[in-house]
Amino acid sequence: MIKMMVCGILLFEFSFLMMLMSLYLLYLNKEFFFEWNIYTFNSMKFNFLLLIDYKSLMFIFLVSMIFSMIIIYSISYMDLSELKMDRFLYLMILFLISMYMLILSPNMLSIILGWDGLGLISYCLVIYYMKMKSFTSGMVTILLNRLGDIGLLLIMGLMTYYGSWNLSFYKMNEFMMIYILLMAFTKSAQIPFSTWLPMAMMAPTPVSSLVHSSTLVTAGIYLLIRYVNLLDFNYKNYIMLIASLTMLFAGLVANFELDLKKVVAYSTLSQLGFMMSMLSIGSTELVFLHLFIHAMFKSLMFMCVGSYMHYMYSNQDIRMYYGMYYIYPMKSMILIFSILSLCGFPFLVGYYSKDLIIEMFFFSKMIYFSMINLIIGTIFTVSYSFRMILVLTSKFLMMNVIYSKEDKIMCISMMMMMIFSLIYSKLIFNLMNFNLLGINLLMIYKLMVFKMIMVGLIMGFNFYKLILLNNKIGYFKMSFLFMNLIYKIIYKKIIMMMFTYEVYIEKSIIEILSSKFMSVTLNIYELKISNLMINIYLTILIYLIYLLIYLINF
């Protein structure tokens, strides 16, 4: 526990230092390259490059700050033995180092260290609980991510033909573009590689909060931000189509999903499609802003959901979370804040990027089919978000039998995360100096955002009514007349207390008394046996003496 607390505090201080350095580089408008020539073979130079600019340092600040809050959060959430806690901490630190290598690497030779490290350590974290479902989910995760690693290796093979590991305009061809897109699509879970992200929810919730919401899944987006100028315009249309379909289908599935953790996972998948579609237009600054803001409120959302699951005995069914606002008001307030940020509620975290991106969609030139997909996907985002708010704030019969005291460490880490997301999102938005005068939209497009929000609210209310109907009829049958729920919430603690009493009091006392009784009995038997042996020895000795005297006299 002390080790994790010290690690979290040190990383928080390091993240603050990285933020100051990024602001300093942004003020100077400078970039730094560090090159280390490892080996030279003919004309090929194996150089290890590091690119340090304000984007890379800002992303390092983001990853370090989220990591520090989640490590402090995990002290209470991951209630494990010391050995398992050390394994969890070391895996998370290895993941953080791999993420640093990915962020700072500008060429394909040095990026492979972070890229392969992310895939391998992500697999180790998904199978952390050592269950069969975790093993199958981890295998799907690593196999789909290995497809992107194959693309990276093929790019490195093609680049040996040109004599350089650095991508450039005059050394690009069609195959390299396809392989770069394959890398980005597999790591950021775009269609048809999007199945691994919901399956990766078998990992512990702190892992999902760090890995599968803010860092690993955004690695493909960050890669394309670096190399977006090398992509052809025709490929950008295909990227827009695939990303819009990802956003549409992820939002559609999230409206029918009853697993609370998977709802947040599909929400992450929808936002990844949203960022990828914006990247196809070419607005890298807006994408980086939304990547930064989305990482904060989505990790916060996972932390809130994980704390609910921690108190509900790992029950992830959304139908069991009715009325949680009245039981855990502080935690519910933080979760509603993150949900409203996801919807782009005015002057919250997501408003600064999402509203501007939607206006850029209407201002840009794209395929009508992609535009329709993005509009419907945005409506679905509001729909499942409003459904979650209705579930939390509604009253339900079983809410009165569920109560567990809120954990202070979890609440403090979530509250700090919410405050930091509010401050830093507005700070980054002001520092990027967007030229908003170039966006001149008609009033009908300005009002389109509010229309989408209203349609999403209506759809969310209808989905909520559908779940409520199924909750009254279907769940009553499924839970065996609520007996499973009553057992988990009421009987389980009593049975565990009885079991503890039997093991540690009754059985231990009996064992102690029986052991003492046996020891006394054995001592008595040993004493009797020793006395018997002495008598036997004396008898034999007397007999021998008598025999000796007899022989002498004879």
Swiss-Prot record:
GO terms for cellular component: mitochondrial inner membrane. It is a multi-pass membrane protein. The chain crosses the membrane at residues 6-26, 57-77, 93-113, 150-170, 175-197, 209-228, 238-258, 263-283, 286-306, 332-352, 379-399, 409-429, 441-461, 480-500, 532-552. PANTHER family: NADH-UBIQUINONE OXIDOREDUCTASE CHAIN 5 (PTHR42829:SF2). GO terms for biological process: ATP synthesis coupled electron transport; electron transport coupled proton transport. This is NADH-ubiquinone oxidoreductase chain 5. Its EC number is 7.1.1.2. It comes from Apis mellifera ligustica. Core subunit of the mitochondrial membrane respiratory chain NADH dehydrogenase (Complex I) that is believed to belong to the minimal assembly required for catalysis. Complex I functions in the transfer of electrons from NADH to the respiratory chain. The immediate electron acceptor for the enzyme is believed to be ubiquinone. Keywords: Electron transport, Membrane, Mitochondrion, Mitochondrion inner membrane, NAD, Respiratory chain, Translocase, Transmembrane, Transmembrane helix, Transport, Ubiquinone. GO terms for molecular function: NADH dehydrogenase (ubiquinone) activity. The gene is ND5. It catalyses: a ubiquinone + NADH + 5 H(+)(in) = a ubiquinol + NAD(+) + 4 H(+)(out). InterPro entries: ND/Mrp_TM, NU5C-like. It is an enzyme of class 7 (translocase). Its main location: mitochondrion. It is found in: Mitochondrion inner membrane. The keyword Hydrolase does not apply. Belongs to the complex I subunit 5 family.
